[in-house]
Amino acid sequence: MIKIKCEAMLKQQMRASAYHLKPADIKKLVIASSNFRDRCIIKTLYWLGLRRHELVNLDVRDIDFERKRVNVRRGKGEKTRIVPMVDDEYVGDLKHLIGGHAEGPIFLSNQNKALSLRAVNYIIEYIGQKAGIENPHPGRKHLNPHIFRHSIARFLKSKGFSAEWIQNFLGHQSYKTTMDMYGTISIDEMQEEAVRKLGE
Protein backbone atom coordinates (compact mmCIF):
# COMPACT_ATOMS: atom_id res chain seq x y z
CA MET A 1 0.00 0.00 0.00
CA ILE A 2 2.81 2.40 0.93
CA LYS A 3 4.63 1.60 -2.32
CA ILE A 4 1.51 2.30 -4.37
CA LYS A 5 1.00 5.63 -2.60
CA CYS A 6 4.65 6.58 -3.17
CA GLU A 7 4.41 5.72 -6.87
CA ALA A 8 1.23 7.77 -7.19
CA MET A 9 2.90 10.74 -5.50
CA LEU A 10 5.92 10.43 -7.78
CA LYS A 11 3.74 10.40 -10.88
CA GLN A 12 1.91 13.45 -9.59
CA GLN A 13 5.16 15.30 -8.99
CA MET A 14 6.35 14.46 -12.48
CA ARG A 15 3.26 15.79 -14.22
CA ALA A 16 4.29 17.59 -17.35
CA SER A 17 2.48 20.76 -16.31
CA ALA A 18 4.79 21.16 -13.31
CA TYR A 19 7.77 21.67 -15.62
CA HIS A 20 8.12 24.73 -17.79
CA LEU A 21 10.51 27.10 -19.53
CA LYS A 22 11.38 30.49 -18.08
CA PRO A 23 10.99 33.74 -20.08
CA ALA A 24 14.79 33.83 -20.49
CA ASP A 25 14.64 30.38 -22.14
CA ILE A 26 11.98 31.60 -24.55
CA LYS A 27 14.22 34.51 -25.57
CA LYS A 28 17.14 32.15 -26.19
CA LEU A 29 14.95 29.95 -28.39
CA VAL A 30 13.74 32.95 -30.38
CA ILE A 31 17.33 34.07 -30.95
CA ALA A 32 18.36 30.54 -31.97
CA SER A 33 15.55 30.23 -34.52
CA SER A 34 16.87 29.60 -38.03
CA ASN A 35 14.45 31.96 -39.77
CA PHE A 36 11.64 34.44 -39.16
CA ARG A 37 8.91 31.82 -39.61
CA ASP A 38 10.40 29.60 -36.92
CA ARG A 39 10.79 32.59 -34.60
CA CYS A 40 7.08 33.28 -35.03
CA ILE A 41 6.25 29.62 -34.38
CA ILE A 42 8.03 29.81 -31.02
CA LYS A 43 6.25 33.05 -30.12
CA THR A 44 2.85 31.79 -31.28
CA LEU A 45 3.05 28.56 -29.29
CA TYR A 46 4.07 30.58 -26.24
CA TRP A 47 2.05 33.80 -26.39
CA LEU A 48 -1.16 32.13 -27.58
CA GLY A 49 -0.74 28.90 -25.58
CA LEU A 50 -1.63 26.81 -28.61
CA ARG A 51 -1.65 23.07 -29.05
CA ARG A 52 0.37 22.03 -32.09
CA HIS A 53 -2.70 21.13 -34.18
CA GLU A 54 -4.16 24.54 -33.37
CA LEU A 55 -0.93 26.09 -34.64
CA VAL A 56 -1.01 24.32 -38.01
CA ASN A 57 -4.74 25.09 -38.39
CA LEU A 58 -4.17 28.81 -37.83
CA ASP A 59 -5.39 30.81 -40.83
CA VAL A 60 -4.80 34.45 -41.73
CA ARG A 61 -8.56 35.00 -41.41
CA ASP A 62 -8.37 33.93 -37.76
CA ILE A 63 -6.33 37.00 -36.82
CA ASP A 64 -8.01 40.25 -35.78
CA PHE A 65 -5.16 42.74 -35.50
CA GLU A 66 -7.47 45.67 -34.80
CA ARG A 67 -8.81 44.10 -31.60
CA LYS A 68 -5.68 41.99 -30.99
CA ARG A 69 -7.59 38.73 -30.92
CA VAL A 70 -7.12 35.29 -32.45
CA ASN A 71 -9.87 32.82 -33.29
CA VAL A 72 -8.41 29.43 -32.36
CA ARG A 73 -9.97 26.42 -34.07
CA ARG A 74 -9.41 23.00 -32.51
CA GLY A 75 -10.60 21.12 -35.60
CA LYS A 76 -13.39 20.78 -38.15
CA GLY A 77 -16.79 21.17 -36.52
CA GLU A 78 -15.30 21.66 -33.07
CA LYS A 79 -15.69 24.65 -30.80
CA THR A 80 -13.45 27.67 -31.20
CA ARG A 81 -12.12 30.05 -28.59
CA ILE A 82 -11.01 33.66 -28.73
CA VAL A 83 -7.50 34.32 -27.43
CA PRO A 84 -6.13 37.83 -26.79
CA MET A 85 -2.71 38.77 -28.12
CA VAL A 86 -1.00 40.19 -25.04
CA ASP A 87 2.50 40.90 -26.37
CA ASP A 88 2.92 43.86 -28.74
CA GLU A 89 6.25 42.69 -30.16
CA TYR A 90 4.64 39.37 -31.11
CA VAL A 91 1.74 41.19 -32.79
CA GLY A 92 4.22 43.14 -34.91
CA ASP A 93 6.09 39.98 -35.90
CA LEU A 94 2.89 38.21 -36.88
CA LYS A 95 1.83 41.16 -39.04
CA HIS A 96 5.18 41.06 -40.81
CA LEU A 97 4.96 37.30 -41.36
CA ILE A 98 1.46 37.48 -42.84
CA GLY A 99 2.30 40.46 -45.03
CA GLY A 100 -0.41 41.19 -47.58
CA HIS A 101 -2.06 37.76 -47.49
CA ALA A 102 -5.82 37.81 -46.86
CA GLU A 103 -6.30 34.09 -46.25
CA GLY A 104 -4.53 30.74 -46.04
CA PRO A 105 -2.35 28.94 -43.49
CA ILE A 106 -0.05 31.25 -41.57
CA PHE A 107 2.77 28.75 -41.15
CA LEU A 108 3.91 27.25 -44.44
CA SER A 109 6.45 24.59 -45.36
CA ASN A 110 9.14 25.03 -48.01
CA GLN A 111 6.61 23.54 -50.43
CA ASN A 112 4.22 26.41 -49.62
CA LYS A 113 1.79 24.09 -47.84
CA ALA A 114 0.54 24.10 -44.25
CA LEU A 115 3.11 22.64 -41.85
CA SER A 116 2.55 19.09 -40.66
CA LEU A 117 2.43 18.16 -36.99
CA ARG A 118 5.66 16.22 -37.42
CA ALA A 119 7.37 19.26 -38.93
CA VAL A 120 6.40 21.37 -35.92
CA ASN A 121 7.89 18.75 -33.60
CA TYR A 122 11.12 18.72 -35.61
CA ILE A 123 11.41 22.51 -35.67
CA ILE A 124 10.98 22.79 -31.90
CA GLU A 125 13.40 19.96 -31.17
CA TYR A 126 16.00 21.40 -33.57
CA ILE A 127 15.80 24.92 -32.13
CA GLY A 128 16.03 23.53 -28.61
CA GLN A 129 19.20 21.63 -29.46
CA LYS A 130 20.66 24.67 -31.20
CA ALA A 131 19.94 26.86 -28.17
CA GLY A 132 21.24 24.21 -25.77
CA ILE A 133 17.92 23.99 -23.94
CA GLU A 134 16.57 20.59 -22.96
CA ASN A 135 13.10 19.70 -21.77
CA PRO A 136 12.94 20.49 -18.02
CA HIS A 137 10.83 17.36 -17.48
CA PRO A 138 13.20 14.61 -16.22
CA GLY A 139 11.43 11.99 -18.30
CA ARG A 140 11.84 13.87 -21.58
CA LYS A 141 15.07 14.96 -23.22
CA HIS A 142 14.00 17.18 -26.10
CA LEU A 143 11.65 20.14 -26.22
CA ASN A 144 8.17 19.59 -27.63
CA PRO A 145 5.46 22.07 -28.69
CA HIS A 146 3.34 21.50 -25.58
CA ILE A 147 6.04 22.79 -23.21
CA PHE A 148 5.25 26.33 -24.41
CA ARG A 149 1.62 25.91 -23.37
CA HIS A 150 2.69 24.90 -19.87
CA SER A 151 5.22 27.72 -19.80
CA ILE A 152 2.83 30.56 -20.66
CA ALA A 153 0.28 29.22 -18.17
CA ARG A 154 2.88 29.25 -15.39
CA PHE A 155 4.07 32.71 -16.47
CA LEU A 156 0.54 34.14 -16.39
CA LYS A 157 -0.08 32.52 -13.00
CA SER A 158 3.09 34.14 -11.65
CA LYS A 159 1.81 37.51 -12.88
CA GLY A 160 -1.41 37.13 -10.90
CA PHE A 161 -3.81 36.05 -13.65
CA SER A 162 -6.79 34.14 -12.27
CA ALA A 163 -7.28 30.43 -12.86
CA GLU A 164 -10.53 31.27 -14.66
CA TRP A 165 -8.67 33.59 -17.07
CA ILE A 166 -6.05 30.92 -17.74
CA GLN A 167 -8.80 28.31 -18.23
CA ASN A 168 -10.43 30.39 -20.97
CA PHE A 169 -7.06 31.29 -22.49
CA LEU A 170 -6.02 27.63 -22.80
CA GLY A 171 -9.47 26.39 -23.79
CA HIS A 172 -9.93 23.95 -20.92
CA GLN A 173 -13.54 22.80 -20.73
CA SER A 174 -13.25 22.18 -17.01
CA TYR A 175 -12.09 24.64 -14.35
CA LYS A 176 -10.89 21.59 -12.41
CA THR A 177 -8.49 20.71 -15.23
CA THR A 178 -6.85 24.12 -14.98
CA MET A 179 -6.62 23.93 -11.19
CA ASP A 180 -5.24 20.39 -11.26
CA MET A 181 -2.54 21.40 -13.73
CA TYR A 182 -1.62 24.94 -12.71
CA GLY A 183 -3.21 25.50 -9.30
CA THR A 184 -0.26 23.74 -7.72
CA ILE A 185 3.27 25.02 -7.22
CA SER A 186 5.79 24.29 -9.99
CA ILE A 187 9.14 22.55 -9.52
CA ASP A 188 11.02 25.82 -10.07
CA GLU A 189 8.84 27.57 -7.50
CA MET A 190 9.51 24.77 -5.00
CA GLN A 191 13.27 25.09 -5.50
CA GLU A 192 13.24 28.90 -5.29
CA GLU A 193 11.20 28.83 -2.08
CA ALA A 194 13.49 26.21 -0.55
CA VAL A 195 16.61 28.26 -1.34
CA ARG A 196 14.98 31.43 -0.03
CA LYS A 197 13.75 29.92 3.24
CA LEU A 198 16.66 27.62 3.99
CA GLY A 199 19.10 30.40 3.24
CA GLU A 200 17.57 32.69 5.85
Where on the chain are the PLM-derived regions?
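Flexible interdomain linker/hinge and immediately adjacent N-terminus
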Residues: M1-K28, R73-K76, K113
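Short, basic (Lys/Arg/His-rich) helix/loop patches that form interaction surfaces
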Residues: Y122-N168
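Short, polar N-cap/turn motifs at the start of nucleic acid-interacting alpha helices
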Residues: I63-F65, S116, F161-M181
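Short, charged phosphate-coordinating catalytic segments
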Residues: L45-R67
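C-terminal catalytic core of Y-nucleophile DNA break-rejoin enzymes
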Residues: G75-K95, G104-Y126
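Basic, Lys/Arg- and aromatic-enriched nucleic-acid-binding interface segment
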Residues: Y19-R52, G77
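N-terminal DNA-binding recognition helix of tyrosine site-specific recombinases/integrases
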Residues: M1-K11, L50-H53, R118, I127
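DNA/chromatin major-groove-contacting recognition/catalytic segments
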Residues: V83-P84, D180, T184-E200
